[in-house]
Amino acid sequence: TAQGFHFNNATMKPIVNNAGWKKAFELYKETGKYGPPEELNLDIGDTRALFKAGRCGLLVEWGDPGPLQLDDDATAIKGKLYAISALGSREVLNRATGELVPVNNVNAPHAIDGINYAPFAAFGGWAGAVNKGADQKTKDAAYAFLSYMNQSAQSSVDVTIGATGYNPYRLSQLSSPDLFVKAGMPQALAENYIGAINGALNSLNMASDMKIPGAQKYTSVVLDTELALS
């Protein structure tokens, strides 16, 4: 993350037209050979329905699929999951040349056994805000609601329900699989699920989603333009 994942930190030019991006698109295109014919038109709800029906051998997602397999309509996959934080690579991008080079201790100091892992914190998490123009009673009510939703008593239930979109985020939720075992996960799966999330969060090489003013414009306008010209 410190290196700048989305763009050159000095020039703000998107890092897209290089061998790393080309390889990523090639791999992404390759996965299409193994998906359903309508894959390009599927949204998140569609893919999760296929997942719960037992039609997915591999799903790249947030942490939601873990508790989603507890749903009544997910009997085809209940207890049959295995989670990992992210796949890695034996090559990394040389930013000076734009080419891929083999992993070594210098260009990938956090690599493990010659493989560089870079879990991506996609989306970046939920946030709540209170309108400063609201009257005080409304502000107090909004604050009380946000506080209630985030306190351990409520959030520790919500993270075990896939439909909430909440994933474990409090230390108490990440330190033990007990919440998920209580919700119905097999012990081994609960340990695997929490372990995968912790593996990503604790990675020294985690790539954070963009958190700058105007990020939406950058990703939907500037980046799209660069990709079209690449």
Q: Which residues make up each language-model segment?
A:
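Beta->alpha turn/N-cap motifs
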Residues: 44, 61-66, 85-87, 124
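Extracytoplasmic/periplasmic substrate-recognition and gating elements
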Residues: 33, 74-172, 207
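Alpha-to-beta junction loops
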Residues: 52-62, 79
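Short helix-initiation/N-cap motifs at beta->coil->alpha
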Residues: 38-53
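Periplasmic solute-binding protein
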Residues: 1-10, 25-29, 117-131, 217-229
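A ligand-binding cleft/hinge motif common to bilobed small-molecule-binding domains
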Residues: 61-77
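Glycine-centered hinge/linker elements that transmit conformational signals in sensory
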Residues: 2-41, 82-89, 101-109
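Long, aromatic- and glycine/proline-rich binding clefts that accommodate carbohydrate-like moieties
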Residues: 97-113, 160-228
